Swiss-Prot record:
<keyword id="KW-0899">Viral immunoevasion</keyword>
<comment type="function">
    <text>Acts as a suppressor of RNA-mediated gene silencing, also known as post-transcriptional gene silencing (PTGS), a mechanism of plant viral defense that limits the accumulation of viral RNAs. Binds to short interfering RNAs (siRNAs) with high affinity. Acts as a molecular caliper to specifically select siRNAs based on the length of the duplex region of the RNA.</text>
</comment>
<comment type="subunit">
    <text>Homodimer.</text>
</comment>
<protein>
    <recommendedName>
        <fullName>RNA silencing suppressor p19</fullName>
    </recommendedName>
</protein>
<dbReference type="GO" id="GO:0003723">
    <property type="term" value="F:RNA binding"/>
</dbReference>
<keyword id="KW-0945">Host-virus interaction</keyword>
<feature type="region of interest" description="Disordered">
    <location>
        <begin position="1"/>
        <end position="27"/>
    </location>
</feature>
<keyword id="KW-0941">Suppressor of RNA silencing</keyword>
<dbReference type="GO" id="GO:0052170">
    <property type="term" value="P:symbiont-mediated suppression of host innate immune response"/>
</dbReference>
<dbReference type="InterPro" id="IPR036131">
    <property type="entry name" value="VP19_sf"/>
</dbReference>
<keyword id="KW-0694">RNA-binding</keyword>
<dbReference type="Pfam" id="PF03220">
    <property type="entry name" value="Tombus_P19"/>
</dbReference>
<dbReference type="InterPro" id="IPR004905">
    <property type="entry name" value="Tombusvirus_p19"/>
</dbReference>
<feature type="compositionally biased region" description="Basic and acidic residues">
    <location>
        <begin position="1"/>
        <end position="20"/>
    </location>
</feature>
<dbReference type="GO" id="GO:0044423">
    <property type="term" value="C:virion component"/>
</dbReference>
<comment type="similarity">
    <text>Belongs to the tombusvirus protein p19 family.</text>
</comment>
<keyword id="KW-1090">Inhibition of host innate immune response by virus</keyword>
Amino acid sequence: MERAIQGNDTREQANGERWDGGSGGITSPFKLPDESPSWTEWRLYNDETNSNQDNPLGFKESWGFGKVVFKRYLRYDRTEASLHRVLGSWTGDSVNYAASRFLGANQVGCTYSIRFRGVSVTISGGSRTLQHLCEMAIRSKQELLQLTPVEVESNVSRGCPEGIETFKKESE
């Protein structure tokens, strides 16, 4: 039975669900440890009344295989070195290995999700398309993290990502 999560319970549950596998753990697709902000940092950078605001110190990403979800919060300061580091937070091999531990003979849904500065991207597919899903996820991650804050804000305020406008024009 599921329970509704409200207010501060959300943060408590997020802290409780953290997969702290050190530098990857045995089955985690991630090669970097969770870098979630401390309680003090969280309060400093977040408004309790606006639950939709992201902490500007980094971004959240997750991999899900069926009902098993691995989550990470990674620090990102928009420098080239930081970008290179966080792009290596997982690889196709580490995702395939983690998925193989949880996926049986049946096709199971696989999901990658990333949230950065109020923009959330989720990519889903079946376990048979995992390699293609990994390729799309790394491209999406790289493009999202390289957007300037102005580009992110304009996309959010327009209510759609950049590619959707192009698709609408081509389909008319």
